[in-house]
Amino acid sequence: MSVSAFNRRWAAVILEALTRHGVRHICIAPGSRSTPLTLAAAENSAFIHHTHFDERGLGHLALGLAKVSKQPVAVIVTSGTAVANLYPALIEAGLTGEKLILLTADRPPELIDCGANQAIRQPGMFASHPTHSISLPRPTQDIPARWLVSTIDHALGTLHAGGVHINCPFAEPLYGEMDDTGISWQQRLGDWWQDDKPWLREAPRRESEKQRDWFFWRQKRGVVVAGRMSAEEGKKVALWAQTLGWPLIGDVLSQTGQPLPCADLWLGNAKATSELQQAQIVVQLGSSLTGKRLLQWQASCEPEEYWIVDDIEGRLDPAHHRGRRLIANIADWLELHPAEKRQPWCVEIPRLAEQAMQAVIARRDAFGEAQLAHRISDYLPEQGQLFVGNSLVVRLIDALSQLPAGYPVYSNRGASGIDGLLSTAAGVQRASGKPTLAIVGDLSALYDLNALALLRQVSAPLVLIVVNNNGGQIFSLLPTPKSERERFYLMPQNVHFEHAAAMFELKYHRPQNWQELETTLVDAWRTPTTTVIEMVVNDTDGAQTLQQLLAQVSHL
């Protein structure tokens, strides 16, 4: 009997089972202990293979692939700290709903806690963050193949969102020629090998429930808050709110077209919040709200009813409103709760939104971070998509820009970390094949600099704008102690990215004005390669411009 041959047959069953649940993209890091899984993935023609040498980046690459494909994405890593590097992407997926399947190779039990190399306690290491955790036994023909495949089917068949951790111990030898070891064990699955369905099929979860009193509430004064959702859902939500005559407060990730732009500016005006107090019901569609003033209003509002509709399970209201938590696909929910044509009830807010946008436009000429955030809608590629980083840049775009309705926007706004942003953007581009504009800050780019290797392989133009304000300038918006702000919060690195781009053979530009930026973008959208654009800006102008606009709009 060949141990290495049976390891591969065991792994082949695992990988084939994944294909029955829609897995097409599989991300693989180098490693020896994961050899059975890697070779099984390589031999399965159903997979699109992605590789990366950095497991943390690999996890985020998978996250980006899952965001666009809406299907589970598998990740294969070797044992040891390689596994721990998947933690950030797993946490993000659990909060934003992407499906990740983490196949982590492991040492067999006799090599754990005895000083063996690269052997750590992997079962349960992700605590409560996976939706399911499976600790497989060492491959053995004493366990029927039907147990293995049905165990995986049960975990994936009930997976609605988040990650599944499948820990896979393999004993040595890991290498060797294939022989007939385990063929009869595999063949006991019969015609499952020729089928395309799971061995064990779980019943789908029940459909959305209709709120029987909706016909009563839709006649009231309502407010629609739009958080993270798909581009198609964003367009439907905008039309739904318009028909109802309810003001729509659209987050940067809502893709609703933000019909009342600059919400995070005008929500700082007492006239706006006073008018919103008249709302009898607030319907929040989607989670992960960005704007500080929006979150403050959301926490303080006291309507008669507060409904939150999102496909993700769990509590999504940090203000703990009394109301209804409705777990449903947003598009399906809208169909069950049709709008009734009514006249808009808000008067002040549309006026304030227009005046706020005019205040922003009046400052658009300076070559700066806030101005780029406002102009970003002018620079979007046709039939493309936008990936927005975290920290200051996403807040500036949320507050100062108005993105087109239905234009795809992606970000990591679950745990809102700055790790893995370039890797996630790479996954977003690969899964869609669309031209992609990604925008991040300098610290975010430094944090995930390894991911420039992933950006060498794109199928359409990708432009990465690095806004270099020399540190974490978001802390300039917070009451951090001035005496320690630079050393312990901003942490300026005084670096530029020309040599990083050159190391990975990526195009690089550092425009000095809007005309140079626009010329660079025109050229970049013509070729299916990555272009790194470093926009060096004054350290504090972005934060200061936002604060000045907030003060100005609050007194309108």
UniProtKB/Swiss-Prot annotation:
* Keyword set includes tRNA-binding: no
Catalytic reaction annotation: isochorismate + 2-oxoglutarate + H(+) = 5-enolpyruvoyl-6-hydroxy-2-succinyl-cyclohex-3-ene-1-carboxylate + CO2
Q: What is its EC number?
A: 2.2.1.9
Task: List the Pfam families.
Answer: TPP_enzyme_C, TPP_enzyme_M_2, TPP_enzyme_N
**Free-text cofactor note:** Binds 1 thiamine pyrophosphate per subunit.
Which cofactor names does the annotation list? Mg(2+); Mn(2+); thiamine diphosphate
Q: CDD domains this protein is in?
A: TPP_PYR_MenD, TPP_SHCHC_synthase
What are the recorded GO MF terms, alphabetically?
A: 2-succinyl-5-enolpyruvyl-6-hydroxy-3-cyclohexene-1-carboxylic-acid synthase activity; magnesium ion binding; manganese ion binding; thiamine pyrophosphate binding
**KW Electron transport (keyword) present:** no
The organism's place on the tree of life at top rank: Bacteria
The GO biological-process annotations, alphabetized, read as: menaquinone biosynthetic process
- Subunit: Homodimer.
Q: What is this protein called?
A: 2-succinyl-5-enolpyruvyl-6-hydroxy-3-cyclohexene-1-carboxylate synthase
Organism field: Escherichia coli O1:K1 / APEC
Query: What taxonomic ancestry is recorded?
Result: Bacteria, Pseudomonadati, Pseudomonadota, Gammaproteobacteria, Enterobacterales
- Name of the encoding gene: menD
